[in-house]
Amino acid sequence: MKFSQATILAIFASSALVSAAPANIVSEQTMVKREDVNAIVELINEIKHINQKRDLAEGEDLLELQRRADSVIGELVSALYNSGVIGLVWDKLTTDPSISSSLSNIIKSAIQGAIVQGGALIQAVWNSGLLGDVFNKLINDTDLRQALLDVGKALFNSAANLISIWLGGSSSSSSAAPAAAAAPATNGASKREIMEAAEYLSERDLASILSWIVQTIKDTGIVQSLVNQVINNPDTVISFLTSALKNGLVIVEDLYDWAKQSGLWDQALVYIQNNAGSWIKALAGLFGNALSNGTITASDINNAGSSSKPTGTTTASTATAAPKAATPAAASAAAPKAATSGSSSGSSSNNADLNALINKYGGGSGSTSTPTVDTSGLSSDVNTLVNAAGQAASSLKKRKLY
């Protein structure tokens, strides 16, 4: 398939814009089909045509043209999404200073009005690498701190399990798709031959088209309509918010305040509790760091969330991430002396947790080659697990040298 005439004209029209575009906006790995770009260009040209007719219309004709424009914009959103270029378009729009204020206001209204759902918001936060910033705000917010601790209890069940995953638990995503990284064999064909045979755009042509798409979206005045449709679409809003956060269009402080006003963080925490499988290692790290710096205590985790119960999905994910420390029963099995005690006091439970860590990370053998954990002087308070965890981490590093 060759370029449509509209696409060819778009490439020529955008040639002057390419030199001004960021050089790294399109990578060599970005593969987009010509037919998908043809569809995008044709939809944008249809919007331009509708706008021209709308300038001369009135009454019912004007309303019909407006309805048609809204429909075509919706089709454009789908075409951008399905082609795989929507993230690139958002990156260019969210870094454009001429529309940054307008976009920021749209996002603010959508979050304050709870048009965006908490699950979509927290996914965008995760994708943009800002989960740690949001976690720190939640854990230091007296209104939401306990809700976050309840999620920690639901995910990890105890401070001992949390520390176990933090220090040495294998991530469920670490071996999820190792084979997928291998590209299909090309039998020695050049990149140009592959691209021509598969009808994919070259890097240069794609950069030209993207510049034209973004400039035309701005010139036709559909930025607000486009973004509003995206925000109302759960399939596309995550990509848009990710770009807005990653590129600094919206800062964490503002986002946090807006979402708190509309109750979105409560929704986000529910989403985390029910869908944290691939995040479990990162979450263990955030909670673990909070334990180590004294922001929270092990008792905060152990005593949290009597009403928060892990769902089946959460339990399975946690078990996958750290099968040896998934349940209190597993910890008891690792420390028979503590488990067989008839006492139900907090001291017995804490000792069982501590012994589980010692058995997991060393300390039972007298061999000089086996790293040990010094537990002398430790009280029965489970908060001392944090100190033991630090020693365990050091022991793990030494063990890997042998």
Swiss-Prot record:
The UniProt record lists the keyword ATP-binding: no
Question: Which superkingdom heads the taxonomic lineage of this protein's source?
Answer: Eukaryota
Entry keyword set: Glycoprotein, Signal
Q: Which residues are glycosylated?
A: 140, 293
**What protein name is recorded for this chain?**
Opaque-phase-specific protein OP4
Q: Which residues form the signal peptide?
A: 1-20
The answer, when asked if Glycoprotein is one of the entry's keywords, is yes
Biased-composition ranges, Low complexity, are: 304-322
Q: Where is this region: Disordered?
A: 302-322
Lineage, opening ranks:
Eukaryota, Fungi, Dikarya, Ascomycota, Saccharomycotina
